[in-house]
């Protein structure tokens, strides 16, 4: 009987650790399922440190915002040692998730929504809409060109939005978006914003 109790207690204490590890290494497919089901909103910030998200953000940065963050090493010998980096001579840059991210329209459109809101404009879809119609999926007419804006509904996903903000804060996108209010009195009323005097900026994931 004592042996049975010890085994049950051991299993109970082992479960949380195993679950935490599983969250840390969440796969792209599992993350996509969470987003589809709306379950990602209720998860802990552990998921935000997922390399899937970070590399998707980097891929987006390369494709839409004109450059890749540097990995902190050179590749004069043709090799990069940092995981997720490859040689863009003479430096190593992050670009490991290009193909996988491209097949995830949910992430791409969420990133686009963030770009529209925080970086002052939408990426262009590569076609004009003089006739009022856009043929590219996820694009609509902002005359005279088509722009990506199909996933406005993705904005309420705080987990994604805050991960994007954390990425922006790292310096890869040139700073934090301003929240649209001042904080002369030291307080910010917009959710997810705090005072970077004299304005409020989005930094909900600083913790």
UniProtKB/Swiss-Prot annotation:
Keyword Signal: yes
Disulfide bonds: 71-85, 75-87, 80-92, 125-139, 129-141, 134-146, 179-193, 183-195, 188-200
Residue positions assigned to the propeptide: 21-66, 96-120, 150-174, 204-207
Covalent link location (Cyclopeptide (Gly-Asn)): 67-95, 121-149, 175-203
SUPFAM superfamilies xrefs: Cyclotides
Keywords: Cytolysis, Disulfide bond, Hemolysis, Knottin, Plant defense, Repeat, Signal
Entry-linked InterPro entries: Cyclotide, Cyclotide_moebius_CS, Cyclotide_sf
Post-translational changes noted in the entry: Varv peptide A and kalata-B1 are cyclic peptides.
Biological process (GO), any one: killing of cells of another organism
Family to which the UniProt record says this protein belongs: Belongs to the cyclotide family. Moebius subfamily.
Entry function: Probably participates in a plant defense mechanism. Has hemolytic activity.
Domains: entry comment: The presence of a 'disulfide through disulfide knot' structurally defines this protein as a knottin.
Protein name, as recorded: Varv peptide A/Kalata-B1
Organism of this sequence: Viola odorata
């Amino acid at each position: 009987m004592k042996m049975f109790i010890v085994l049950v207690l051991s299993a109970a204490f082992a479960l949380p650790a195993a679950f935490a590890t599983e969250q840390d290494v969440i796969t792209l497919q599992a993350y996509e399922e969470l987003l589809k089901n709306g379950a990602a909103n209720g998860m802990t910030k552990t998921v935000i440190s997922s390399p899937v998200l970070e590399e998707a953000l980097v891929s987006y940065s390369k494709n839409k915002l004109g450059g890749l963050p540097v990995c902190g090493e050179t590749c004069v010998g043709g090799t990069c040692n940092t995981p997720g980096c490859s040689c863009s001579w003479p430096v190593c840059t992050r670009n490991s998730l290009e193909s996988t991210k491209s097949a995830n329209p949910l992430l791409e459109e969420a990133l686009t929504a963030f770009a529209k809101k925080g970086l002052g404009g939408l990426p262009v879809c590569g076609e004009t809409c003089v006739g009022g119609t856009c043929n590219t999926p996820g694009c609509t007419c902002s005359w005279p060109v088509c722009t990506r804006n199909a996933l406005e509904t993705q904005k309420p996903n705080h987990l994604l939005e805050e991960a994007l903000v954390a990425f922006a804060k790292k310096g890869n996108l040139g700073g934090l978006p301003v929240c649209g209010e001042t904080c002369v009195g030291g307080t910010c009323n917009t959710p997810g914003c705090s005072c970077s005097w004299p304005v409020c900026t989005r930094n909900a994931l600083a913790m």
